């Protein structure tokens, strides 16, 4: 099993080197790694994780944790030996267990002088545009403040099933939400193998591949184990979801000593799945190809010059007029005074708000609206020139 496969014309050492440079990681830790065989939290193990997470933070990595374990902790607190089958009982266990889960994370991070925050998400939070933007704004603010967000699904209020589908998918969506550079999925396997390593002694670990390489499909779907390769296809699917925003994914064994800090150092651990494009390229291409625009902004010559020559954000002061019934977060087109479309992007204000602040300096937005979402009408990260 020491043999490592490299699929396609990829250089693993070069690909791994990026882990030493990137600054925002979403790290998913599953129940098998956080609990004592599904019966309550493994506090010593959590302490070791936090030691590594704190070391990453000191090294300049912004960490977001997607944590399982609420149901298992709830079962322990309620004295239940078997996982319940009824949805309302699962939700009750999650509600009880979430208290202990968050307290445990908080206590461990407190040893390193770090603040934590609990974020509970549902599918609707990430499918509704306004709620998505609110969640993104809150998370990015917490990250900028140096707080470690602890994210889980809001199991107590979901109505269709107890889980998002799986926390791998949730972690990938969170990686897209916060525009993470890397998604780290910690599992009880060493990574993705070309064959089931439990029944094939000649199985080889895939060291690096493109996330969308179809050759991986058969490797990930050949077993039905609940915690092993049976869950590997969901991890592959999560890596493909994360790759849409340009994030690379590492699927790696969570019980490897100092696994997170060693990944940061570029050690060849686990399976590295690469996106087809860099994060900023993927986002800009998505913006350029987003055909359905909801409104139109006409810019003065100064704003056009700042956007095209300096790559700056679009401020309200540079906008001459607003047309359309768009809402915050929707796509709008930007035109110069001659009627040429020069850019498009995701707007930070509803149309009725934008009408009130066009031509106004950003520091006056709050006095006009009574609040301020952002100083920019369109942030440069959400803007693409045409």
Swiss-Prot record:
All residue ranges annotated as the PUA domain in the record: 294-372
GO annotation, cellular component aspect: cytosol
Top-rank EC class of the record's enzyme: transferase
GO function term, MF aspect, one: ATP binding
Pfam annotation, one family: PUA
SUPFAM superfamilies named in the record: Carbamate kinase-like, PUA domain-like
Keyword Protein biosynthesis tagged: no
Catalytic activity: L-glutamate + ATP = L-glutamyl 5-phosphate + ADP
Pathway of action: Amino-acid biosynthesis; L-proline biosynthesis; L-glutamate 5-semialdehyde from L-glutamate: step 1/2
Binding sites annotated in the UniProt record for ATP: 28, 187-188
Xref: InterPro entries: AceGlu_kinase-like_sf (IPR036393), Asp/Glu/Uridylate_kinase (IPR001048), G5K_ProB (IPR041739), Glu/AcGlu_kinase (IPR001057), Glu_5kinase (IPR011529), Glu_5kinase/COase_Synthase (IPR005715), Glutamate_5-kinase_CS (IPR019797), PUA (IPR002478)
SMART domains cross-referenced by the UniProt entry: PUA (SM00359)
Subcellular locations according to the entry: Cytoplasm
List of residues binding substrate: 68, 155, 167
Domain of life: Bacteria
Cysteines joined through disulfide linkages: none
E.C. number(s) listed in UniProt: 2.7.2.11
Keyword annotations from UniProtKB, A to Z: Amino-acid biosynthesis, ATP-binding, Cytoplasm, Kinase, Nucleotide-binding, Proline biosynthesis, Transferase
CDD domains (alphabetical): AAK_G5K_ProB, PUA_G5K
UniProt-listed NCBIfam families: proB (TIGR01027)
Family: Belongs to the glutamate 5-kinase family.
Function recorded in the entry: Catalyzes the transfer of a phosphate group to glutamate to form L-glutamate 5-phosphate.
Full protein name: Glutamate 5-kinase
Organism ancestry: Bacteria, Pseudomonadati, Pseudomonadota, Gammaproteobacteria, Oceanospirillales
């Amino acid at each position: 099993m020491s043999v490592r496969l490299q699929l396609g014309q990829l250089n693993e050492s070069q690909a791994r080197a990026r882990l030493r440079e990137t600054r925002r990681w979403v790290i998913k830790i599953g129940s098998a790694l956080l609990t004592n065989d599904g019966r309550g939290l493994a506090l010593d193990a959590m302490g070791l994780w936090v030691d590594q997470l704190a070391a990453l933070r000191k090294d300049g990595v912004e960490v977001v944790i997607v944590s399982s374990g609420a149901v298992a902790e709830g079962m322990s607190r309620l004295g239940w030996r078997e996982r319940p089958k009824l949805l309302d009982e699962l939700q009750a266990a999650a509600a009880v267990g979430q208290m202990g889960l968050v307290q445990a994370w908080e206590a461990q991070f407190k040893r390193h002088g770090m603040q934590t925050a609990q974020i509970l998400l549902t599918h609707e939070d990430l499918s509704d545009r306004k709620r998505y933007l609110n969640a993104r704004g809150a998370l990015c603010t917490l990250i900028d403040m140096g707080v470690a967000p602890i994210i889980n699904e809001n199991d107590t209020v979901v109505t269709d099933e107890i889980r998002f589908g799986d926390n791998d998918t949730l972690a990938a969506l969170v990686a897209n939400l916060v525009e993470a550079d890397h998604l780290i999925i910690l599992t009880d396997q060493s990574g993705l193998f070309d064959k089931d390593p439990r029944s094939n002694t000649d199985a080889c670990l895939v060291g690096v591949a493109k996330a969308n390489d179809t050759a991986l499909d058969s490797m990930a779907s050949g077993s039905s184990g609940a915690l092993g390769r049976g869950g590997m296809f969901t991890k592959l699917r999560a890596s493909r979801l994360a790759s849409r925003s340009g994030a690379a994914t590492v699927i790696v064994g969570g019980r490897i000593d100092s696994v997170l800090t060693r990944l940061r150092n570029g050690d060849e651990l686990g399976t590295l799945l690469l996106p087809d494009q860099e994060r900023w390229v993927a986002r800009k291409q998505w913006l350029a190809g987003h055909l359905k625009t909801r409104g139109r902004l006409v810019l003065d010559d100064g704003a056009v010059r700042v956007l095209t020559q300096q790559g700056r954000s679009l401020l309200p002061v540079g906008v001459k007029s607003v047309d359309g019934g768009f809402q915050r977060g929707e796509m709008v087109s930007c035109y110069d005074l001659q009627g040429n479309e020069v850019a498009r992007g995701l707007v930070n204000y509803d149309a009725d708000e934008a009408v009130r602040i066009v031509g106004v300096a950003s520091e006056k937005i709050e006095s006009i609206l009574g609040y301020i979402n952002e100083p920019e009408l369109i942030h440069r990260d959400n803007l693409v020139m045409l």
